[in-house]
Amino acid sequence: MSVSGFGFQAPAEDSIAIDAVSGWPALSTGEFRELRRIPEFFSEKAIEDSLNRSVAEIQQQILNYVTGNFVGQASTDTEVPFTLGASLAPNFSAQQISIYRGAVYARSHADLLGYFSAVDQKDAGNNKAQDVDQQHAILAQSNRAVRLLLGLGRAGVHAL
């Protein structure tokens, strides 16, 4: 059993592998919890669901860009700093795997931030606008990481 800072004990749950057989980098709820300092009161299932959503969003974003299947892009010949395998899984370097992991974990962190504030209400005068600002900042981390994977700068006209 682990003790959370909220006065109750949450049973320790086993880490759940995320997207382990697709050819994309494998992730896990335990690693996410450790790297993003996720509170213990979130069940592994809730974290798994969030990570699966984030993985699907980021993979779709990357594949749509690489294959030219997104608004404003007609070419199917987009240059990116990695190759795609036969299953459309990228052949990422170790550095790119780290960047991908950061993109997914930041996106899920932003996704779960609304739950954080609902469960962890601080002082009565807590400013909810601050939570939204934090959520946007964390989501921006994810978007910057995806742009880096695609070989793009921090911002572009098509991102506006």
Could you say what each language-model-derived stretch is?
Residues 87-160:
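Short loop/turn elements at secondary-structure junctions
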